[in-house]
Amino acid sequence: MRVMITCFPAPAHFWPLVPYAWALQSAGHDVRVVAPSGFPSPTGIISTDFAQRVTESGIAAVSCGPPTPLAVHDCDDPGFADVLPNPDETERYVRALSVHERVERDMWDVFYHYAILAIRNYQPPRPREDIDEIVAFAKDWRPDLVLWEPWFPCGAVAAKASGAAHVRTLISPDYTAWAHERFVSRGLPSMLAEAMQPLAEHHGVTVDNELLLGQATLDPIPAGMRLPTRTPTVPVRYLPYSGASVSEHWLRDEPQRPRVAISLGVSARAVDKGDSTGRIPALLEAVDGLDVEVIATLNKDQLSDQVETLPDNVRAVDYVPLSQLLPTCSALVNHGSFGTVIAGLSHAVPQIVCDTDEPTRLFGRATPDGVEWDRTSPKQGYSTLTANYLADRGAGSRLDHQKQSISEIRSMLRRVVEDPGVRDAALRLREEEWASTPTPAQLVPWLEKLAQEG
């Protein structure tokens, strides 16, 4: 059968989908990854070489439309300011939706400030040529099945317009379903439905729950990390993939001391262009003198701000795939993204998740020169969720560099590396919430049946 995969054109959104593409292609199906052509973004979040990232994985890429700025940066569009998140709107909805608890506010903030912004960027009120071309490709190629991720639901419109079966594929906790259900339960128009309406109408597609949430949802989120929603999902094992590269020779050598990885996210460093929080200097000072070997995946921007010299036990590398690094590690220090945390979980590596009590909100103000951004915190939007998930199960710890001293951070590192109870908890968590779920390859027959039934 023909399978079309669509996603927001950034590595962090594509990489989680690669194992599905491999499984389907290995079963003899024709798989294409279809996405907008890249365009340089002031925030750095869009990959201008996205098609190359796709083909590096061994999957055929289809780039659609001319390079076009995100709606939020399209100053030639008089309505571009309407796409921007703003404080008045978010607080109005927080009150209307009765979002009170800290964990619920975190869910709302990720949905409103990031997920719905991504959706609005590619589905503004005015049609976009790149998105129209994706729909046109689907109508012409006639896929049997479309896989799409929640930050790029125009894949669902392409599926409906072409008559294909379609499956929503989660790449992070299900904030869109949680928020959509919250709106519906309060009798309010769904923000997700409103964002989808212009594109759906443009292509003659009805906005309903199936369009918004898929005919089915593949869910790689461990049971203990899932958000409270009523949307049924099909559990699937998350298989980490983080790009193609040549394996470094030093990775083949057995570490002489416990190896600790520090990984703070490729998307985060693309956006932040450095470290304004003091987190990196605190981590490097804490590991200095410990009897460990540290591999820090930090680039020159992240090191140049506040780091004069690296400790003797630290090797800084711009990039190394976690799938190659983690099997050699005794601990992983990370920023709390789902992909990084589950990569660590898949190798039963004890973890320390960097998290603070700050909110994660992003506001934009239109100016004559473009957009002036105000970001309350550079932390990962759901780092509190992932940190608590690991800490509550004994497989890791939560690190708040704003409140914990260097001595406390150093003690935390020692415990995570040396305590066999933490390693045992990580092994148990791997078996119970990762290894027990079916792989993408095992779900191919189910996907084939779904596509056949339409």
Describe the residue ranges of each PLM region:
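A nucleotide-sugar donor-handling region in carbohydrate enzymes
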Residues: 41-43, 190-268, 299-300
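A donor-sugar binding/catalytic signature common to diverse glycosyltransferases
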Residues: 21, 317-386
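Conserved nucleotide-sugar phosphate-binding/catalytic loop shared by glycosyltransferases and other
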Residues: 39-110
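Donor-nucleotide binding loops and adjacent catalytic segments primarily
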Residues: 236-331
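Conserved nucleotide-sugar donor-interacting segment of glycosyltransferase catalytic cores
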Residues: 98-106, 110-197
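Short, polar loop motifs at secondary-structure junctions
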Residues: 36-39, 46-48, 150-153, 220-225, ...
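N-terminal subdomain of nucleotide-sugar transferases
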Residues: 1-68
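C-terminal amphipathic helix plus adjacent low-complexity
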Residues: 407-454
